[in-house]
A protein has these predicted regions:
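Terminal, non-catalytic protein-protein interaction segments that mediate quaternary/complex assembly
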Residues: 1-176
Length: 176
């Protein structure tokens, strides 16, 4: 058998959890996603971290960074709503960027993000997406991440009234 089974529902619902700002594996499990169980409860460095708040805590990883990024003044920035509102208004300032990659808070989360940045562009009535990934296990994660990227483009286009056009995935370190 030369094809690997893909799990589109898990990929999409994991992204839904990020968009909701989840910080607990139990929140993901409540929507049918088990992808965070091991990172939250079995990764030795995180299990022993003084920043871990208990069983199932994933910390300030993906969802927390997306919905509650800490600004220089301590105020929280909701990257998702900021980008959504600018896309919906048709304002492409070449800064329609959502990122989960916050080096100042790596120790506050279970792991550093692999698929870490999404940058949108508006051209006419079309929405484009370019996504950056620092690391990719091609055998296990590639199809999962591609589903998430396409879902991100199609969903953002749908809720902003634009047409989804093209998604590009840039991978810096692909490995087997």
């Amino acid at each position: 058998d030369s094809t690997r089974k893909s799990y589109p529902k898990s990929a999409i619902f994991e992204k839904v959890g990020y968009w909701r700002g989840y910080e607990w594996a139990s929140q993901f499990r409540n929507i049918g996603v088990k992808t965070w169980d091991a990172n939250a409860n079995e990764t030795e460095a995180w299990v022993n971290s003084p920043y871990r708040k208990g069983e199932d805590h994933i910390g300030r990883a993906y969802g927390a960074q997306l919905r509650r990024w800490k600004g220089h003044d301590g105020k929280e920035i909701d990257q998702l709503m900021s980008v959504y509102e600018r896309i919906r208004s048709g304002k492409d300032d070449r800064g329609l960027i959502m990122t989960f990659y916050n080096p100042g808070e790596f120790e506050l989360g279970a792991l550093r993000p692999c698929l870490h940045t999404h940058q949108f562009s508006i051209l006419g009535d079309g929405l484009y997406l370019e996504s950056q990934q620092r690391s990719n296990d091609t055998a296990n994660g590639q199809s999962f991440n591609q589903i998430q990227i396409f879902w991100t483009l199609y969903t953002m286009a749908a809720i902003t009234g634009l047409k989804p056009k093209k998604a590009v995935q840039n991978i810096a370190n692909a490995h087997i």
